[in-house]
Amino acid sequence: HVGMIYTRRASEAAPGDVTLQDRHTVGADFDFYTSQFLGQYNAQFEGFVLYHTDPVTGGDLSASERSSRGVRWSFPNDLIRVHSSHREFGEEWNPAVGFVERRGFRRHQPTLTIAPRPQNWQYIRQTEHEIFFEYLTDLDDRLLTRNIDITPLQLNFESGDRASFEVGRNFERLDSAFTIYGRGDDAIRIQPGVYESDKWSVSANTAGRRMLSGGVSYESSEFWGGDRDSVDLSGTIRSRNGMSLTANYQHNEVSLPQGDFDTNLLRLSWAWNLSPFTAITGNVQYDDLSNVVGVYARLRWIIQPGNDVFL
């Protein structure tokens, strides 16, 4: 498919402020997919480009500073799955409608997964072996982030259960300090610099088709010049068709040269599918770092396929 988007946001400057123009954003994307690549394989090619006008009358921002673009190709097949993506966001990319978490960067991200199906292993349906690589720079090609994650082995059982082991290495360039824990004079701050870290993790998950299912994972890693141990637990109950309740708990123990601290996160989520056309979902979340409880709920009503109402 090929898609397009256009948004306009009117602006009214306050007395004495720089005159603001109405903000216009235009963009296009495409997604081409085939199941007949080389006669028998799946393949996909995607891309997008977006541009917005200068918010200030007579502004001097270049078109490249006010645009973003990206492409992605993938080969999503059973034995071999490979994809690679590239995206770039201008230094002044700031559409009036919508937002991004980061701007002024280039990101390359290839992944290779090999997933054979052993013929002589009675309880093993498939094994997976994956290499994930991320390389992120600023627009002057200065390295900001580099991640290498390797999954030497993931076991997918005939029962639907899974178990995996993963190792990884991270590079992070921090240009400004930030507070990671606490407030005031007792705050623990991470200072600018270059940080490299290693990690390893193990995880196990039971099949989601069961009335009771869950998962557990443990990760040990270097963390901003110190160490972190993390435990993640989850459990789901499906008391009847169309209803589910999931609880997640995460505990982190962090040890840094500046000080030690622990964090806890608890989340409860639910889904109730009243019919094929109506569903209620939501979650409640609390963490002892912010001491804030967040609540989210949504009702979705499908009037007809392609026409949905959300509340």
Language-model features: locations:
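A conserved hydrophobic secondary-structure block that centers on an alpha-helix together
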Residues: 1-21
